[in-house]
Curated annotation (Swiss-Prot):
Alphabetized InterPro entries for the sequence: 4Fe4S_Fe-S-bd, AAA+_ATPase, ABC_transporter-like_ATP-bd, ABC_transporter-like_CS, P-loop_NTPase, RLI1, RLI_dom_1, RNaseL-inhib-like_metal-bd_dom
Superkingdom, taxonomy of origin: Eukaryota
SMART domains per record: AAA (SM00382)
GO biological process, one term: rRNA processing
Role description: Component of the multifactor complex (MFC) involved in translation initiation. Required for the binding of MFC to the 40S ribosome. Required for the processing and nuclear export of the 60S and 40S ribosomal subunits.
Protein name according to UniProt: Translation initiation factor RLI1
Domain (4Fe-4S ferredoxin-type): residue spans on this chain: 7-31, 46-75
Length: 611
């Protein structure tokens, strides 16, 4: 009987439509044919119900379902006794829980839809874990008894006695203005009304909130809202601080400032938990890491805590040595050379753009003349408000430079920074309307559409898509339009760590095959260095006076950029991902003295010599 219980049957409530099909799942099920009620569904029922006890895991119904609504998975038997929470019959379930430790930062890493936000809800006391018994949930005594002997026992006892005050920074900061109900909506009022610690000045200075202090929340940009949300959490006195994706919308400098202010909250008796997809920031922030693996929207499993380096490497490698389990087919690495070996591109055509200036209100951007060739990706690095998007629009011809300077006309396809879905209809209809030729080409399907896994939601309404799904649709739309230059503004926003690496591979391969040029704005440093052939560094005063340098090689460009930020990076010897050095550590001081803020390639032997 034990192995029978290890099936997970998931019915997707958005896709399952019993009124529109002939109940193929029920008719094809061998258990139903033998007279047992394994699948129960009538045209009147809202969704099909599959009994996991009776299911034999034959895998026929997922193939027969015309809407692709059923997923059947066989789980390792030892997991069955560790269910922490399940929402309903045939729905997502979470196994185990991350274990927060007082006085240290716990990082959670895993793909979207694998239970990180569910784990945060449980740990913040908003959701009571039902241990998989969704029909008769256990009371708190049983829950605490279940977790006895682990660090979670004391934690839940405190939650039960109302001893734990948890503050959460939400994932979607763009929804904050709608949630503010007070008549006074200024940043000053909202922060000061919640203030219960005396670190207000430090928070305002580190997060650069002074110049927006008197502004209305409804007038803030994405990055300003993010810093406001982090600041609001940091001035409150609490026992548990939770940050759900604190780095989206922020540039590299602000990400590190946010990381420093989050680490400053640590006291011997409080807990800090962070969910983050930018792996270099997660690495810098956390003291230890829990990896979540499984299948998105089906089940999620939390691993035991690992050290930061080991945890992130396990996630990238796709293999957990302690459980001897592989949860992803291929491992993800960051060799700079791997991209260039596959594609030896003939750089036949060169484009030039002139030196130009552009004034927008009080903001002035000066651009040095530069040139670029086809099959090349140029990444723009700089703080928010230094004119990267303005430069994209100058290239695209949307804005005209000051004076008589003219940019040569080129066909340009652009993916904007913010995506607002206005299209009425499904994703497939949108593609057929905008990029029919590309969408029907087999090369485009294998290079772009398949790796980004658009088939999962291709027949859903565009308006109902999540942030990450919209982002992938926007990338496909931008690449599908025939053009000389592709301008992609922040392709990593809303994507999880795995999708970011896939997206950067897709963009890189597409640009090489199509022999075109791409200009990319990207703040995730790992993704930016993976993509870039050359770099344009933007410096100056954000929002006032900025300067775009001419395109430089990746090494010199990153060194210039990091020198402005006063940050150094080293490389991990196993998978070559860039890692931030702790401020004033020995490596940090050595690299600053020698002027090497960033390494292109560093073998394991060099790393050993150093250590």
């Amino acid at each position: 009987m034990a192995d029978k219980l290890t099936r997970v049957a998931i019915v997707n409530s958005d896709k399952c439509k019993p009124k529109k099909c002939r109940q193929e799942c029920k008719k094809s099920c061998p258990v139903v044919r033998s007279g047992k009620l394994c699948i129960e569904v009538t045209p009147e029922s809202r969704i099909a119900f599959i009994s996991e006890q009776l299911c034999i895991g034959c895998g026929i119904c997922p193939k027969r379902c015309p809407f692709g609504a059923i997923t059947i998975i066989n789980l390792p038997t030892n997991l069955e006794s560790m269910i922490t929470h399940r929402y309903a019959a045939n729905s997502f379930k979470l196994h185990r829980l991350p274990m927060p430790r007082p006085g240290s930062v716990l990082g959670l890493v895993g793909t979207n839809g694998i239970g990180k936000s569910t784990a945060l809800k449980i740990l913040s006391g908003k959701l009571k874990p039902n241990l998989g018994r969704y029909d008769n949930p256990p009371d708190w005594e049983e829950v605490i008894k279940y977790f006895r002997g682990s660090e979670l026992q004391n934690y839940f006892t405190k939650i039960l006695e109302d001893d734990l005050r948890a503050v959460v920074k939400p994932q979607y900061v763009d929804q904050i203005p709608k949630a503010v109900r007070t008549p006074d909506k200024t940043v000053k009022f909202l922060i000061e009304s919640r203030k219960s610690m005396d670190n207000l000045d430090e928070v305002l200075d580190t997060l650069e909130l002074r110049h927006i202090y008197d502004r209305d929340v409804t007038h803030l940009s994405g990055g300003e809202l993010q810093r406001f949300a982090i600041g609001t959490v940091c001035v409150q006195k609490a026992d548990v601080y939770m940050f759900d994706e604190p780095s989206s919308y922020l540039d590299v400098k602000q990400r590190l400032a946010a990381a420093r202010i989050i680490r400053s909250l640590l006291r011997p008796d409080d807990y800090v938990i962070v969910v983050e997809h930018d792996l270099s920031v997660l690495d810098y922030l956390s003291d230890y890491v829990c990896v979540l693996y499984g299948q998105p929207a089906v089940y999620g499993v939390v691993t035991l805590p690992h050290s930061v380096r080991e945890g992130i490497n396990i996630f990238l490698d796709g293999h957990i040595p302690t459980e001897n389990l592989r949860f992803r087919e291929e491992s993800l690495t960051f060799r700079m050379v791997e991209g260039t070996e596959d594609f030896v591109a003939e750089k036949s055509r060169a484009f030039k753009y002139p030196a130009m200036e552009k004034t927008l209100g009080n903001f002035k951007l000066r651009v040095d003349a530069g040139s670029f060739s086809d099959s090349e990706i140029i990444v723009m690095m700089g703080e928010n408000g230094t004119g990267k998007t303005t430069f994209c629009r100058l290239l695209a011809g949307v804005l005209k430079p000051d004076g008589t300077t003219r940019v040569p006309e080129m066909r340009i396809s652009m993916k904007p920074q913010t995506i607002t879905p206005k299209f009425e209809g499904t994703v497939r209809q949108l593609f057929f309307k905008k990029i029919k030729a590309a969408f029907l080409s087999p090369q485009f399907q294998t290079d772009v559409v398949k790796p980004l896994k658009l088939d999962d939601f291709i027949d859903q309404e565009v308006k109902n898509l999540s942030g990450g799904e919209l982002q992938r649709v926007a990338i496909v739309l931008a690449l599908g339009i025939p053009a000389d230059i592709y301008v992609i503004d922040e392709p990593s926003a809303y994507l999880d760590s795995e999708q970011r690496i896939v997206a950067s591979r897709v963009i890189k391969r597409f640009i090489m095959h199509a022999k075109k040029t791409a200009f990319i704005v990207e703040h995730d440093f790992i993704m930016a260095t993976y993509l870039a052939d050359r770099v344009i560094v933007f410096d100056g005063k954000p929002g006032i006076d900025a300067h775009a340098n001419k395109p430089e090689s990746l090494l010199t460009g990153c060194n210039t950029f990091l020198k402005n930020l006063d940050v150094t990076f080293r490389r991990d010897p196993t998978n070559f991902r860039p890692r931030i050095n702790k401020l004033n550590s020995q490596l940090d001081q050595e690299q600053k003295l020698s002027g090497n803020y960033f390494f292109l390639e560093e073998g394991p032997d060099k790393e050993k010599e150093r250590s």
